[in-house]
């Protein structure tokens, strides 16, 4: 994938790195643009609980890895040929390399965030590193060095707006993968499936409970299977 090189005066092309495509689709804005809710406080992403606010953005990334979708948006800059299937398979394998460790790391972050906000008592002093060490014993594969001070740089839960909400990244991954699995079953460009996602997810903003909206779209509560399969982890 390529884009015009705006930093050059010559008519050359600059590579559109694959990660850039993911970043383009991640904050694509459909949740805001397609809202049908007139009340500002619950339209678009406004008023959407942390449990589901990342669902549409992570959902959109799935199209980056579908051959049928890539045929529309990719092409060799000289021949116009779409991305070869064998190259996509290699990219998928690279994406899923050590995916299980990534999931465990996200669980570690989420649990640490929860416990930090649920158990902190100013009069008893902060047990930040002790709390992290306890969590790592539960979920971490590789121990941290004794001099490690990761919590001091965990900006998401202090300055990033995700205090007691970091878990939503991984939970949104579950929701997004499970929602996309319906498209995999019915066709990634199936018009009726897309309309259902618009009617039940994108257009509703924060006007209803996310679980109710998800069940209307998927016909059931979320399941983990699709997310694990997307990461190449199959039982």
Please place each PLM-identified region on the residue numbering:
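Cation-handling catalytic/transport regions enriched in His/Asp/Glu
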Residues: 1-235
């Amino acid at each position: 994938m390529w884009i015009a090189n705006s930093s050059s005066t010559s008519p050359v092309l600059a590579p559109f790195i694959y990660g850039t495509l993911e970043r383009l689709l991640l904050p694509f804005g459909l949740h805001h643009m397609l809202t049908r809710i007139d009340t500002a406080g619950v339209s678009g992403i406004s008023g959407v609980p942390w449990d589901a606010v990342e669902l549409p953005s992570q959902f959109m990334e799935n199209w980056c890895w579908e051959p049928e979708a890539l045929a529309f948006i990719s092409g060799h800059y000289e021949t116009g040929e779409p991305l070869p299937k064998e190259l996509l398979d290699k990219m998928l394998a690279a994406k899923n390399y050590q995916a299980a460790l990534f999931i465990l790391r996200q669980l570690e972050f989420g649990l640490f965030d929860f416990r930090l906000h649920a158990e902190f008592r100013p009069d008893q002093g902060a047990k930040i590193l002790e709390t992290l060490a306890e969590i790592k014993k539960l979920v971490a594969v590789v121990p941290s060095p004794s001099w490690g001070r990761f919590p001091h740089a965990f900006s998401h839960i202090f300055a990033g707006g995700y205090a007691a909400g970091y878990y939503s990244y991984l939970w949104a991954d579950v929701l997004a993968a499970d929602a996309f699995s319906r498209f995999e079953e019915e066709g990634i460009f199936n018009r009726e499936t897309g309309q259902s996602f618009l009617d039940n997810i994108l257009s509703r903003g924060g006007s209803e409970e996310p679980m109710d909206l998800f069940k209307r779209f998927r016909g059931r509560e979320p399941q983990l299977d699709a997310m694990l399969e997307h990461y190449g982890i199959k039982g």
